[in-house]
Swiss-Prot record:
Name the record gives this protein: Adenylate cyclase type 1
Binding site for Mg(2+) 1: 310, 354
Modified positions (Phosphoserine) in chain numbering: 553
Recorded catalytic activity of this chain's protein: ATP = 3',5'-cyclic AMP + diphosphate
A GO CC annotation given for this chain: membrane raft
Superkingdom assignment: Eukaryota
Regulation of catalytic or functional activity: Activated by G(s) G alpha protein GNAS. Inhibited by G(i) G alpha protein GNAI1. Is further activated by the complex formed by GNB1 and GNG2. Activated by calcium/calmodulin. Inhibited by the ATP analogs adenosine, 2'-deoxyadenosine and 2'-deoxy-3'-AMP.
Length: 1134
């Protein structure tokens, strides 16, 4: 990012913020981007303009203070001139002070306009500097009041070398410290003023030539001291402010980046769950309420239509696919179905293998929900027909519809998936299974909702399905009047004979699908949730404008542009809405302390990077005082000793600060130590300057009875002496004024102790003048320019330093407040990001969620992964159907699902143990729990080595599930039984579905694992021969069941996993020390794996695929849950 300020070598060749030129990173925690504040302005003009806008109101306040001081200065001199006080020859300044006073007041009025912008303020500063220059030049000792020398009775006396020096020193310091002009301009002003006074003094002021060079040298040293201090104060104050601005900008940039990430996470979350459910679950997930039972997130909808659809012929097609081809093919097909669902106002619920089911009227109640589902079914059939005609692959769609009541929501604690339950859902599933390819199969209930808008024919579903026959359900087929939709690019007649392709493999099919993108515009999963859509942008900008009215909030959404430009635009809007009054409300008006004690404490803990430099500069000033003292002021042993002590002490302070910086900085240099050191250093330097003053004042003078001053002599005569005996008294007084300047360089010392110290120093200065008799000696008791000027000078200097101290304190505190608020909001956003990530990791596997969060949506590809060895488990509760019933007394089945939620939640809580960290819950299908192990990304050799360990973990988890279910049975007086099937082998994992992305695994391994469950025995764990081979060398006990007929696989040899055995051969549930050992013995209840098993029926006699809870996938994964079915219903038939 070209935001680094220009260095002395001219580093101005940077582009806009966010580009590569001049980019620098701050060495802060987390590698935040920083822009190094080196010199006066940033290389990036946009960033410099932002900084000027950021400092506008503070600079405006400083300009008002500067103009107030200049007006007071000119007004005081004009008042002294008006009263006709005798003084030095007025020269060209005669009559100019009132004019300058009016000019400064006029600029003060103009500056006080609230709508003043940066260019106008800069012009005001330049005009103020110009008027200050003319004021300073006219204060030089031109001596045009008459001939050189004294005039008897004249009002003017000869000009002196010290004439106008204090005015020029004050104006120079004001130009550096308070005026909003460029540093080079302020430096030029200081040099011109100093050079002009020295030149005029050298040429026009009469003086003894041998002493002139000493006077000019003393003046030059005083001008040098003020210029050095002014430059230091200006540069360090601006550096501190620029650093705070950059810190705030970096925090805002991080905050916006985190906001983008959070927006991705929120959109990802909203794509997986309905908003109302997601928000409620998120709140409870982050702040779990105290409750005995787990909260259930179920809603009831009484008037919806449910559609189940299955792709006929897809199993054989998919069996030939590679991992990439399979995921692409599924995403293409189901992505198109998601688009059709959106167009037809349906919400897709789940994808189970090649089965797709959705509901209309769920999230948004619709009176024509039946029409929407019928249109959806017909569109799906047309889509598959178009694919079949274009590719010459035998594919078709079987669709079943029913209208009724559903319970929708989420069960469990991990891997939430939105689902629906009810007897009507079961019936819709049966309608699909009993339908015919290419037909939309509907019930009489659905037909009644269509109001005769569609032609129908008898469906005779009872002839193909026993459930329909048992429950005497009449069914119908929708008869489309004509080919409803023509999808360009996929109709066979549109393909030229010369280019018609005969597909022999799936690869050719996929190539053709890619060529036919006019129909298939399926999005990459999650790609549509990674960027803001137009509506969201407009809504975000409206929200931003509202939030910008409140300064304390940085929350907004900004249109995505270049990162640096976006941050700069955002800060620009914040500055437009910035209100100093609101920010000052956080500070105490008098002490400027934060009203929040904790914030004040943190502010005082900030490191003062320039404290050592301030002490070095104080040492330089002490050395300058020493030179002035040696040049022009009469020496005394006491002052010399004080000067030596001051310099030695300051050198020791510099060494101490260097040591503390190396060893323990900033812990050793607390705010209390810095304040004490600052006060002592200022008092010490001022004491040196005041020692010069004391040595030059006429302490032997006393008042005569008539008010004149006399010197007491041994002769008794009382001659009146009109002048003090020390010719260097004016320069000593000037040293006293400049001696207060060290207060200005300790920037991070609070203004309150500075102002108290200024009051003490000013009082002591005035007391020395009065007690020494200096004022009476100079003016003989009357108001005189000579006698009044030192008091006027010290008052104006003290006023300027007090205003500057307060201004710097306000600047630093508001800068810190700005940066602290930005940092707090960034930290809050970081916390939100972590919270959202926790939720996302609860919806998707951690490595999958991280993949989508880290991916660039423009370069995102389909996520898929092929695994050679993965353990897959299906655990079902087959007798849950006997328990599920819909009655008014149980809220139409909600209370039954509440118990199922407890069971699934307890299963989920098992995965919180470190022992099961490698397990991944895939989903729940009704009362069936699906999990896998070995999906975490690992190297191939490592995966082969640890597959036995993974299977051992999966087997232990299955065993402990029996323990958990038995405990629930004991507490709820139920008799649920678990039936588990486990298989191991290659699988394909991926994310499909553009609108409702879903992570799943596919493959023959998954199908066989499902069959191990559906063909298993209640209370037993059935495993394949491969699982037995990998685990038999461990401490597991198996019983060979024999060969079992498995759909699509023929006869398979299977085993029952009986449990684990210890070294003595006795049977236990697990060797894991973390296992929770339930006290079943108190009720005489044993774990089912430890108790006697029910007799196993002969393998040949098992009704494969029949019975409650049977899961029979259609080639890729289990079909929709048989648990939806009421007693006696069968599962989904492919």
């Amino acid at each position: 990012m070209a935001g680094a300020p220009r260095g002395r070598g001219g580093g101005g060749g940077g582009g806009g913020a966010g580009e590569s030129g001049g980019a620098e990173r701050a060495a802060g925690p987390g590698g935040r981007r920083g822009l190094r504040a080196c010199d006066e302005e940033f290389a990036c003009p946009e960033l410099e303009a932002l900084f000027r806008g950021y400092t506008l109101r503070l600079e405006q306040a400083a300009t008002l203070k500067a103009l107030a001081v200049l007006s007071l200065l000119a007004g005081a001199l004009a008042l002294a001139e008006l009263l006709g006080a005798p003084g030095p020859a007025p020269g060209l300044a005669k009559g100019s002070h009132p004019v300058h006073c009016v000019l400064f007041l006029a600029l003060l009025v103009v500056t006080n306009v609230r709508s003043l912008q940066v260019p106008q303020l800069q012009q005001v500063g330049q005009l103020a500097l110009l008027f200050s220059l003319t004021f300073a030049l006219l204060c030089c000792p031109f001596a045009l009041g008459g001939p050189a020398g004294a005039h008897a009775g004249a009002a003017a006396v000869p000009a002196t070398a010290d004439q106008g020096v204090w005015q020029l020193l004050l104006v120079t310091f004001v130009s550096y410290a308070l005026l909003p002009v460029r540093s080079l301009l302020a430096i030029g002003f200081g040099l011109v003023v100093a050079a002009s006074h020295l030149l005029v003094t050298a040429t026009l002021v009469p003086a003894k030539r041998p002493r002139l060079w000493r006077t000019l040298g003393a003046n030059a040293l005083l001008f040098l001291g003020v210029n050095v201090y002014g430059i230091f104060v200006r540069i360090l104050a601006e550096r501190a402010q620029r650093k705070a601005f950059l810190q705030a900008r970096n925090c805002i940039e991080d905050r916006l980046r985190l906001e983008d990430e959070n927006e991705k996470q929120e959109r990802l979350l909203m794509s997986l769950l309905p908003r109302n459910v997601a928000m409620e679950m998120k709140e409870d997930f982050l702040k779990p309420p105290e409750r005995i039972f787990h909260k259930i997130y179920i809603q009831r909808h009484d008037n919806v239509s449910i559609l189940f659809a299955d792709i006929v012929g897809f199993t054989g097609l998919a069996s030939q696919c590679t991992a990439q081809e399979l995921v692409k093919l599924l995403n293409e097909l189901f992505g198109k179905f998601d688009e059709l669902a959106t167009e037809n106002h349906c919400r897709r619920i789940k994808i189970l293998g090649d089965c797709y089911y959705c509901v209309s009227g769920l999230t948004q109640p619709k009176t024509d929900h039946a029409h929407c589902c019928v249109e959806m079914g017909l569109d799906m059939i047309d889509t598959i027909t178009s694919v079949a005609e274009a590719t010459e692959v035998d594919l078709n769609m079987r669709v079943g519809l029913h209208t009724g009541r559903v319970l929708c929501g989420v069960l469990g604690l991990r891997k939430w998936q939105y689902d629906v339950w009810s007897n009507d859902v079961t019936l819709a599933n049966v309608m699909e299974a009993a339908g015919l390819p290419g037909k939309v199969h509907i019930t009489k209930t659905t037909l009644a909702c269509l109001n005769g808008d569609y032609e129908v024919e008898p469906g005779h579903g009872h002839e193909r399905n026993s459930f329909l026959k048992t429950h005497n359900i009449e069914t119908f087929f929708i008869v489309p009047s004509h080919r409803r939709k023509i999808f360009p690019g996929l109709i066979l007649s549109d393909i030229k004979p010369a280019k018609r392709m005969k597909f022999k493999t799936v690869c050719y099919l996929l190539v053709q699908l890619m060529h036919c993108r006019k129909m298939f515009k399926a999005e990459i999963p999650f790609s549509n949730v990674m960027t803001c859509e137009d509506d969201d942008k407009r809504r975000a900008l409206r929200t931003a404008s509202e939030k910008l009215r409140n300064r304390s909030s940085f929350s907004t959404n900004v249109v995505q542009t270049t990162p640096g430009t976006r941050v700069n635009r955002y800060i620009g809007r914040l500055l437009e809405a910035r209100q100093m009054e609101l920010e000052m409300a956080d500070l105490n008006f008098f002490t400027l302390k934060y009203k929040q004690a904790e914030r004040e404490r943190k502010y005082h803990q900030l490191q003062d990077e320039y404290f050592t430099s301030a002490v070095v500069l104080a040492l330089i000033l002490a050395a300058l005082f020493g030179l002035v003292y040696l040049l022009i002021i009469p020496q005394s042993v006491a002052v010399l000793l004080l000067l030596v002590f001051c310099i030695c002490f300051l050198v020791a302070c510099v060494l101490y600060l260097h040591i503390t910086r190396v060893q323990c900085f900033p812990g050793c240099l607390t705010i209390q130590i810095r304040t004490v050191l600052c006060i002592f250093i200022v008092v010490l330097i001022y004491s040196v300057a005041q020692g010069c003053v004391v040595g030059c004042l006429p302490w032997s003078w006393s008042s005569s009875p008539n008010g004149s001053l006399v010197v007491l002599s041994s002769g008794g005569r009382d001659p009146v002496l009109p002048v003090p005996p020390c010719e260097s008294a004016p320069h000593a007084l000037l040293c006293g004024l400049v001696g207060t300047l060290p207060l200005a360089i300790f920037l991070r010392v609070s203004s309150l102790p500075k102002m108290i110290l200024l009051a003490v120093l000013t009082t002591s200065y005035i007391l020395v003048l009065e007690l020494s008799g200096y004022t009476k000696a100079m003016g003989a008791g009357a108001i005189s320019g000579r006698s009044f000027e030192p008091i006027m000078a010290i008052l104006l200097f003290s006023c300027t330093l007090a205003l500057h101290a307060r201004q710097v304190d306000v600047k630093l505190r508001l800068d810190y407040l700005w940066a602290a608020q930005a940092e707090e909001e960034r930290d809050d956003m970081e916390k939100v990001k972590l919270d959202n990530k926790r939720i996302l990791f609860n919806l998707l596997p951690a490595h999958v969620a991280q993949h989508f969060l880290m991916s660039n949506p423009r370069n995102m590809d389909l996520y898929y992964q092929s695994y050679s060895q993965v353990g897959v488990m299906f655990a079902s509760i087959p007798n849950f159907n006997d328990f599920y019933i819909e009655l008014d007394g149980n809220n139409m089945g909600v209370e039954c699902l509440r118990l199922l939620n407890e069971i699934i939640a307890d299963f989920d809580e098992l995965m919180d143990k470190d022992f099961y960290k490698d397990l991944e819950k895939i989903k729940t299908i009704g009362s069936t729990y699906m999990a896998a192990v070995g999906l975490a990304p690992t190297a191939g050799t490592k995966a082969k080595k640890c597959i036995s360990s993974h299977l051992s973990t999966l087997a232990d988890f299955a065993i402990e599930m029996f323990d958990v279910l038995d405990e629930i049975n004991y507490q709820s007086y139920n008799d649920f039984v678990l039936r588990v099937g486990i298989n191991v082998g290659p699988v394909v994992a991926g994310v499909i579905g553009a609108r409702r992305p879903q992570y799943d695994i596919w493959g023959n391994t998954v199908n066989v694992a499902s069959r191990m469950d559906s063909t298993g025995v209640q209370g037993r764990i059935q495993v394949t021969e491969e699982v037995h081979r990998l685990l038999r060398r461990g401490s597991y006990r198996f019983v060979c069941r024999g060969k079992v007929s498995v759909k699509g696989k023929g006869e398979m040899l299977t085993y029952f996993l009986e449990g684990r055995t210890d070294g003595n051969g006795s049977q236990t549930r697990s060797l894991n020390s973390e296992r929770k050992m339930y006290p079943f013995g108190r009720a005489g209840l044993q774990t089912r794996l430890a108790a006697g098993h029910p007799p196993v029926p002969p393998a040949a006699g098992l009704p494969v695929g029949a019975g409650p809870g049977a899961l029979q996938g259609s080639g890729l994964a289990p079909g929709p849950p048989g648990q939806h079915l009421p007693p006696g219903a069968s599962g989904k038939e492919a």
